[in-house]
Amino acid sequence: MLDVNFFDELRIGLATAEDIRQWSYGEVKKPETINYRTLKPEKDGLFCEKIFGPTRDWECYCGKYKRAPFKGIICERCGVEVTRAKVRRERMGHIELAAPVTHIWYFKGVPSRLGYLLDLAPKDLEKIIYFAAYVITSVDEEMRHNELSTLEAEMAVERKAVEDQRDGELEARAQKLEADLAELEAEGAKADARRKVRDGGEREMRQIRDRAQRELDRLEDIWSTFTKLAPKQLIVDENLYRELVDRYGEYFTGAMGAESIQKLIENFDIDAEAESLRDVIRNGKGQKKLRALKRLKVVAAFQQSGNSPMGMVLDAVPVIPPELRPMVQLDGGRFATSDLNDLYRRVINRNNRLKRLIDLGAPEIIVNNEKRMLQESVDALFDNGRRGRPVTGPGNRPLKSLSDLLKGKQGRFRQNLLGKRVDYSGRSVIVVGPQLKLHQCGLPKLMALELFKPFVMKRLVDLNHAQNIKSAKRMVERQRPQVWDVLEEVIAEHPVLLNRAPTLHRLGIQAFEPMLVEGKAIQLHPLVCEAFNADFDGDQMAVHLPLSAEAQAEARILMLSSNNILSPASGRPLAMPRLDMVTGLYYLTTEVPGDTGEYQPASGDHPETGVYSSPAEAIMAADRGVLSVRAKIKVRLTQLRPPVEIEAELFGHSGWQPGDAWMAETTLGRVMFNELLPLGYPFVNKQMHKKVQAAIINDLAERYPMIVVAQTVDKLKDAGFYWATRSGVTVSMADVLVPPRKKEILDHYEERADKVEKQFQRGALNHDERNEALVEIWKEATDEVGQALREHYPDDNPIITIVDSGATGNFTQTRTLAGMKGLVTNPKGEFIPRPVKSSFREGLTVLEYFINTHGARKGLADTALRTADSGYLTRRLVDVSQDVIVREHDCQTERGIVVELAERAPDGTLIRDPYIETSAYARTLGTDAVDEAGNVIVERGQDLGDPEIDALLAAGITQVKVRSVLTCATSTGVCATCYGRSMATGKLVDIGEAVGIVAAQSIGEPGTQLTMRTFHQGGVGEDITGGLPRVQELFEARVPRGKAPIADVTGRVRLEDGERFYKITIVPDDGGEEVVYDKISKRQRLRVFKHEDGSERVLSDGDHVEVGQQLMEGSADPHEVLRVQGPREVQIHLVREVQEVYRAQGVSIHDKHIEVIVRQMLRRVTIIDSGSTEFLPGSLIDRAEFEAENRRVVAEGGEPAAGRPVLMGITKASLATDSWLSAASFQETTRVLTDAAINCRSDKLNGLKENVIIGKLIPAGTGINRYRNIAVQPTEEARAAAYTIPSYEDQYYSPDFGAATGAAVPLDDYGYSDYR
């Protein structure tokens, strides 16, 4: 068997009949499958043992040879080779066809490859192949030319004979008529009778003339057809063809069916044809040139690949191994079989019948009919349903052909090659495990025992609890007491992977150290729920076991949950306290005026109270019940660092050192909170709202190693749960308070609504205006009720606590519960002008309940659609970007993009750019950042983290040039410096990181949060697409809905205002030709933008516009942007537009992820003029390949090719990839394979998908080449240590062995030398 790791590329081509016979182990001659009595395969049938190998190991068909010693012998009685039965999975057979057939992929695909090659229309081709017309395959022009005059003379003689015969017959008939008339006259017959006779005579003479004329026309037809006869000419009229053969058979050959196609291909001169087509392209115009281009693609493919076009017509059909199309017996004596067997049986039956008919010398028409049926049966085998009605099995179900086995979600590619099921896995319901550390999970005992069974069995044998593996297995199955101790030992330090479907981003699979727990549920750490998007309402998770040492090392170092705190999309922590924990910390750090033990200043004879010498003393007071944790106190602190401003004031330049005392005015709760933070973190004297907690953890992630952050969030979690329990926050009916002012507020608005209603009835308002007015009124009412509610609720109300702390929910939900529901929408997405006035606490009326259901149901339907759409978007994004891998450290390019850090306000202060987090943050600086005095603030090549950005802003720098993947010069993949910091680790990205996949996941994962609907803005204007449809529109590079024109040139605008349309003319500044935009619908509205004088207003007559400026409301067409402003601008445009959609939903994704995808969309160039290169005009070429080829041609002194960049949608870009395996497994499988086979395409196996399909390690992460070939070289100390002989007393282990926490060791602590 071929080892998959030893080949570098995979080529696909056309198989000729010779190849098929070479693969085959014998010909299948009979349609029989299995003998129904003996259940053994029939000889020469579809399951024949002689061809495909024995059905049982080392046993021939007749039973003469049994068992392994006879290996390799071929039995002389039954002819079966004695070998393993698994060869029935590998050995192929073939069927020798009695007549050739065409391969349906090449004839019926769009475009028809056979048609392009032979220059025949697909309709004509179909007529020939399915025996409806004859085609001329060759003409002996020389012989015809030489003997033309002789033949013409013969033809003239024949015509003369016909004419003479006609004239003779007419003469005789005329004489007979004369005689008849004379006779009648003599008898004195009436004129009537005479007229009848005359008419009859004339009619007969007319018939004679017509008959002769028909004969002459036929001769003329035969002659003209013969003189113009040329190869590839179609003759549909059978009689005409027969005549031609009878008369001039020796001058030409013709036939019908696939044989004629085979002949035509045999006589086809590829080189000459390619030359003549190139000629046409050089000198031709219009349709002719286009057709020649398309044909040249196919012809050149055969010319360059060395494929023989004969492979498109088959003389033999391969039969796949029988184990791949099995036949199994069901209970009840019936058989279940693969559809392929039925399809093969039809082919064999028809083929055998055709052979018999040919042997019998049957009439041509019967033989042709049988050949047509054979062609149809082979078509059905290869691609059932591609032409005509599909062949159906029982119950009118179309049979699954070979193509169907590859196509679609259930096909071979997506079902078995890209999505395999995994051994050593289990799944169960998850429950919360608040006692766990961040890197741990609770694994049910029974599940762990089953997962680790082989390890436990081996260990039982090692420890002599069992004699052999078999008894060990028995012990495990009977769950003997010793087994549990061994299991504890085996699972220690062996990480497991937990996965929750749907795995939307890479944090959907993380590694944990298992702890054995009772019960059958997996326990999950509460902080990783965010990353998994898990909750405990019945979610299930799967467990997988990494087996090899390398897999365990990767799981521990790269996938352990405590090393994956940051989100790969935004680089901000995901493992944050949420829900109960937030409530707990919020409660703990709240300050309640007048609470027990509050600080009282000294007054008169009372000394001050509520002052404590240390946190320990305060805690003691709290335990005795004289101090509340939420009361304001003064406390002397020595182990907590003061806030920055106090530190500067108290300790000056030297700064605070642990042990320095300072006095804090705070609450005991806040002191306890700060003790959870790492030593040396400035004291935070605030109420811990969710946002504040997030900011602190963010800051920790920037400044401290991951291990510290992990320990801190774990402590915060414990404290959060502890205090949430003690806070007693619960929700009961009594907590939902209805504001007493609600009725009077609603009465007031009811009056206003009545007024509007009256105006409408008087006709002062139309229907739309009335609705708008009512909607406005009730929106105000709802807000006012909300306001009243807010004032009415006390601060310690649990519902308000939950909302205010940011734990969950928002004020709208509180208002719905206790205030009023407000306006709801109808199924069209418009507001219903009657509001829901009740709150859920009071209960809804029947009508209110009914109108409320619209929105609720639409929400559910929307969510389901969104999930599917978003999943499909992610799949396309992954597909287009899967080969973007970091391949080198630095591509040394000078180029980059400019990002804004801040804007100067009119008074000179800097206003920080709101999107700095997703644009400049975590990038590499492209040039030195210099302030006005010329001092370098941050050097080129520095990573921009929060401290660096703050430094730049402090120096007054408003924009910087950063490296970006859009300008990266690496030919395949990207370089680490252009990509910048990896968002998930906070360090420069590693070589081998699959940044394409990460980008696709980061964009796709929040996809489900985006809205589905297109929202209406202002009612009158065009719908502006938003949400998920807009993201799809951008990535697919479609022309947007409500497309807005952009200025082609810089110049002055002349605006002509028509009745229904605008006409905009731009007069260019450089005096060029005027640009006119005609018939622009007024519904679209003119664009508002900043003018030269700084004012913001609508575009009007005489305004000055820059090139690329949008003139109307709506969205610019990216293809237009590319045409007018070039590739750089369109890249920036796409990134900006995609970000707008995500920001509207409050989703933070870094620009670099979108840039990776956009880079893939602009990878190709379309060739305009091929110069001296091999490229075909109009073809799409990878930019790197285009530039390399041009350099080569110029170096040889030739003309370079001219091309222009082209923007491709992600689906198109995925299908245009160089890897045919990846494209075929994505969409349109048959089309991709057809094309790849004709071009003899080679797959270089650069991307991830192709390697997964063939089962190689993926070329990313530790699978990249440079990491595969590492040899470990021991240091001198290691060598010395290896040769010292330990004495008996020597500690074999380090003294602290066994005291380890099991937490991951931070990689930062190890010094790595350069790994090359």
UniProtKB/Swiss-Prot annotation:
Q: GO molecular function: any one? A: DNA binding
Reaction(s) catalysed (UniProt annotation): RNA(n) + a ribonucleoside 5'-triphosphate = RNA(n+1) + diphosphate
Annotated Zn(2+) 1 binding lies at 60, 62, 75, 78
Q: Per its UniProt record, what InterPro entries does this chain match?
A: DNA-dir_RpoC_beta_prime (IPR045867), DNA-dir_RpoC_beta_prime_bact (IPR012754), RNA_pol_asu (IPR000722), RNA_pol_N (IPR006592), RNA_pol_Rpb1_1 (IPR007080), RNA_pol_Rpb1_3 (IPR007066), RNA_pol_Rpb1_3_sf (IPR042102), RNA_pol_Rpb1_4 (IPR007083)
Which Gene3D superfamilies does its entry note? 1.10.132.30, 1.10.150.390, 1.10.1790.20, 1.10.40.90, 2.40.40.20, 2.40.50.100, RNA polymerase II, clamp domain, RNA polymerase Rpb1, domain 3
UniProt-annotated binding residues for Zn(2+) 2: 891, 968, 975, 978
Determine if Amino-acid biosynthesis is one of this entry's keywords: no
Instruction: Kindly state one GO CC term assigned in the UniProt record.
Output: DNA-directed RNA polymerase complex
| SMART domains associated with the record | RPOLA_N
A GO BP term, please? DNA-templated transcription
Q: How is the cofactor bound?
A: Binds 1 Mg(2+) ion per subunit. Binds 2 Zn(2+) ions per subunit.
The organism's superkingdom is given as Bacteria
Cofactor(s) listed: Mg(2+); Zn(2+)
Keyword hit for Nucleotidyltransferase: yes
- Keywords attached to this entry: DNA-directed RNA polymerase, Magnesium, Metal-binding, Nucleotidyltransferase, Transcription, Transferase, Zinc
Residues binding Mg(2+)? 535, 537, 539
- Which EC numbers does the record give? 2.7.7.6
- Subunit comment for this entry? The RNAP catalytic core consists of 2 alpha, 1 beta, 1 beta' and 1 omega subunit. When a sigma factor is associated with the core the holoenzyme is formed, which can initiate transcription.
The function of this protein is:
DNA-dependent RNA polymerase catalyzes the transcription of DNA into RNA using the four ribonucleoside triphosphates as substrates.
Give the family from UniProt: Belongs to the RNA polymerase beta' chain family.
Query: Under what name is this protein listed?
Result: DNA-directed RNA polymerase subunit beta'
Which species? Mycobacterium bovis (strain BCG / Tokyo 172 / ATCC 35737 / TMC 1019)
